Regions:
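A conserved hydrophobic secondary-structure block that centers on an alpha-helix together
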Residues: 22-53, 132, 144-178
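Segments forming glycine/polar-rich beta-alpha architectures that bind adenosine-containing cofactors
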Residues: 15, 20, 24-41, 45, ...
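Extended, charge-enriched "interface" segments that sit outside catalytic cores
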Residues: 1-4, 324-368
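Single conserved hydrophobic/aromatic residue that forms the stacking wall/gate
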Residues: 369-380
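A short beta-strand/loop micro-motif in the catalytic core of glycosyltransferases
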Residues: 177, 276-282
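Extended, Lys/Arg-enriched charged tracts that mediate electrostatic binding to polyanionic substrates
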Residues: 69-115, 280-288
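Membrane-proximal helix-turn-helix segments that form the acceptor-binding/catalytic region
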Residues: 203-214, 220, 247-277, 305, ...
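Conserved oxyanion/phosphate-binding beta-strand-loop segments in alpha/beta enzyme cores
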Residues: 1-18, 116-136
């Protein structure tokens, strides 16, 4: 853990609405969060220079139970932050750090917490404090909870608040990675910062594009976040002047068809327009995403766009049974966990006998039976 990050690779700031690290920390709901959590764990194992931004939800996503007639019941259970594996981030006065995020004509105040994911620092924002109104305290109550206005307030906190958090921490990175369009507004704040330093808008957006990466998970347009111009303008109306552009210019960055006043602002379109690299999460999904976003780049074929793919992976130590870990430790290179993309290391599997693999498989099968049989009986 004391080894310094690999300076030969670009440093990364990662933004996501959810992280699946452990069932103890209820800040995830499904695959998007599990991928993000594994991403941080793998970054730690491979000694990448990375930090991450997310939310510390008071209730997280709901816990599912079933009624006697088989209907789903959603239970929201409050987390006791004092019993979680998290640390308060302190300011220069020794008090818990607070980030002030502008909303309309007032500020929302977010506490900053840290989760140590191996070598990686995950900073979590929390608005459930007495400095905020009842409505703003609820911004970080539930993952994907509330109406569209609350969703926009969450995405402002993640994007704009996330960048302000890094600034307050004194952290600068080479690449800014949006895990889904929820974090797209990081590039609004980054453009504002560059313009405040004396750059023109055109210079600022090129710098932002060159250092931004957007990962899209959703395969259909209906799954992306769209905001009516009235609602979006209610909270974002003050930003165009700081960016050096007009309101229509900002809206057009989030439209498939710039100039169409009836089209809503799409976070995913904005992310595509302000990111040099966009990737789907499999080869097929990359192709689907090229078609889905094709209308953004008029006059180009879908395959000519900068939308590619990186196939989803998992964090090996998290998802491997202890028995398999012992087998790999006995036969694989000691650097296996730190260089899993090296095919030569994987060739060691051919040195493992069929008998040993079969024995391990049967041990796991018996373990599954021991788990599943009592569960089966309880439902009969």
């Amino acid at each position: 853990m004391d080894v310094k990050p690999d300076s030969k690779r670009p440093s990364v700031a990662y933004f996501s609405m959810e992280y699946g690290l452990s069932h103890v920390l209820k800040i995830y709901s499904g695959g998007l969060g599990v991928l993000a959590g594994d991403y941080l764990k793998e970054a730690s194992d491979s000694n990448a220079d990375l930090c991450a931004i997310g939310f510390l939800y008071r209730y997280g996503y709901f816990t599912q139970t079933l009624s006697m007639d088989g209907q789903q019941i959603a239970n929201y259970e409050a987390q006791n932050f004092g019993q979680l594996p998290i640390d308060r981030v302190l300011d220069e006065k020794g008090e818990q750090m607070v980030v002030d995020v502008p909303y309309l004509d007032y500020y929302v105040h977010a506490y900053v917490w840290r989760v140590n994911v191996g070598r990686i620092s995950l900073y979590l924002l929390d608005t459930d404090n007495e400095m905020n109104s009842e409505f703003d305290r609820s911004i970080t109550h539930q993952l994907y909870g509330g109406d569209w206005e609350n969703r926009l307030k969450q995405e402002i906190l993640l994007g704009i608040g996330g960048i302000l958090t890094l600034k307050k921490l004194g952290i600068k990175k080479d690449i800014y990675h949006c895990n889904e369009g929820h974090a797209a507004l990081i590039n609004v704040q980054r453009i504002c910062d560059y313009v405040a330093e004396g750059l023109t808008y055109d210079q600022a957006i090129e710098l932002v594009r060159a250092s931004s990466l957007y990962t899209v998970h959703t395969p259909v347009p209906a799954g992306h976040d769209y905001f009516d111009e009235g609602l979006f303008g209610k909270y974002m109306g003050g930003y165009p002047s700081r960016m050096g552009i007009s309101w229509d210019d900002l809206m057009d960055l989030g439209r498939n068809n710039p100039g169409d006043k009836g089209e809503r602002f799409c976070m995913s379109v904005f992310a595509c327009n302000t990111s040099q690299e966009v990737n789907g999460v499999s080869w097929l999904h990359g192709k689907v995403s090229q078609e889905m976003f094709a209308s953004i780049w008029k006059g180009y074929f879908p395959e000519e766009s900068h939308v590619g793919y990186v196939t989803n992976g998992v964090h090996f130590p998290t998802w491997s049974a202890t028995e398999w870990k012992h087998l790999y430790a006995a036969h694989f290179d000691e650097n296996f966990l730190y260089d899993q993309s090296n095919p030569k290391i994987w060739e060691a599997i051919y040195n493992v006998s069929d008998e040993e693999i079969w024995k391990t498989r049967m041990v796991m099968k018996l373990s599954l039976i021991h788990i599943s049989e009592p569960t089966r009986r309880s439902y009969i």
